[in-house]
Each structure stands twice: as structure tokens, then as C-alpha cells.
Amino acid sequence: VLLATSAVGAASEKPNIVIIMADDMGFSDIGCYGGEIKTPHLDRLAAGGLRYTHFYNTGRCCPTRASLLTGLYPHQAGVGNMIRDQHLLGYRGQLNRDCVTMAEVLKSEGYWTAAIGKWHLTRYDNPNDKAADRSSWPLQRGFDSFFGTLPGGGSYFDPKGLTRDNDPTVAEDGFYYTDAISHEAAEVVRRANQMHKPLFLYVSYTAPHWPLHALEEDVARYREIYAKGWDKLRTERYQRMVELGLIEKQWKLSPRDDRVPAWEDAPDRDWQIERMAVYAAQIDRMDQGIGQILEALRQTGQLDNTLLLFLADNGGCSEVIA
């Protein structure tokens, strides 16, 4: 899924560039792509910008991130799969020195560069290890500032590998990772404005990647919606996608996955409702945070000189988590 909008100022003024990435999110999850999940901020961006119906990335998160930041095939950047070193040129598990990142290029052009959220482009993802090779960490690959996690998925309440710049940091009481990413990104917007520098901001949410961790106030809004079951929900999504022009009318709804029973035959339906509601709440919370970032751009007078790009890294997750 990709969503882009741009409204740039004078030709001589360098635009801010803000890239926002969701993690393991399905094509039709958000409202402007047919989903029942409430995403008003993304929907407004879609209405005022460019909504893609054909957009390609890789099937795993690390290769997509490598390609996005370097403009290369992931193997050329050294991340042909995940972050395990397979001792093959294209599968070293972290960014190599034969590639240049967007941050490195934009920094040389006077941009202030910041990465917030999930990194997942280094084999050495423990910030407490003083001897760790930091050559593929954000600050060593062109970013002036970093707050987030070096590894992939993990707890939203106490994430592993939480890092500020090159040093470990801790989750305070009441910490929720999606909110922390949003707050930090909004602060970066305000800081860059005070510095009078164009901004390159890479915001990489972990939502809605497993584990299913959400706040009760968000989950409560979705239980009734998902009580109708996945068969009715997927039919409704399909109909909305046709109405939005995302798919052709002659493209019929695909059969339900053989591994998934009909909703009326599903065991533990209350538990299934809860799972779907929590997943939706994770995306809802991310959209709320995107609203905070947009508001910071608006308050600083930078919104009309900012190119915004929203995408997901690899589509919905098909893994079964025990």
C-alpha cells in the first residue's frame, strides 16, 4: 500500500521529505483502501494527494527497508533476506558499504535527517553491547538523529533494543511504542523548523506487526465491528474496494483461505473478535499519531512545503504465531 501527497513551495525552497512506513499491514486495512479501520488522517491525505493502486516492494521487511533507503535491489545493498549473515555477497544481513542511503545524500544537500522507529538493517542490534559494530546503524548511515528499535518486532510496552542515537534508552512508565514514535516525530518536525533546515524524516512504525498489543480505549471501539465475523467483513471490504476504483468489478472475491473456517464454524469466536479488534486498534493508534505529525507540520508552517509518502513494508503477515 502506498499513499503520497505533495504540495511544495517556491522552486528555490527545498521541500521537507517525510516517509511513514507501517509494518505488516494489509493492502485493504486502512479506510481509503476499503478497510473498516478508522484512519481519518490517512484518508484525508489520500483525498488530497495521489493514491497508488500498483506499488511493489519485497515480501519481507528488511529487504524492503534496504531498497527504500538505497534505491537498489536489496541484494545489492547486502540485505537479500533478513538480518542473518549467510556469508554470501547479497545476504550479509546489514547494509554494506557499496550503497549510499537517502539520508547520506540528503545530508550532503543541507537536510537535517532523522529516523524514528524500527530500523532492522543491522546484525548488531543490541545497543547495550559497547563492542557492537555500529557501521550499519542509523547515525553511521547518514541520519543526524535516531530514536527507535534496532531489531524487528517486539513488545509495544517494553521494546527490546530501544536506542537513542547510538546509546541504549529505557521505556518509562506508561510507554506505548506507537505513541512514542509519533511524539518523537512531531518533536523532530518542530526542532528542524527552529534550525531553519529542510527535513528528511523517516518514520517507521512497528504497528500493526505482531505481537497484538493495543490500548484498551482503542480496542473497545472495534469489538462490535468485528463481531460480524471475517466472512461478512471481507465481503464488505471487497465491495468498498470496487466502489473506490481500486479493483475492477470483474475481479471476483477470492476464496477464503483453506486454513480458515467459515465464521459460523470458527472456534473461540470471542477470542477471534478480540484479535481482530486489537489489530485494528494498532492501526487506529498509528493514524492518530500520523495526525500529530501532520499537526506539527501545520503549526510550523511547513505542511505546504512537504512531500509525504506513506507505505507498508510487505503487506499483511501470513505467519501463524503460537
What do these predicted regions represent?
Residues 1-322:
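Formylglycine-dependent sulfatase
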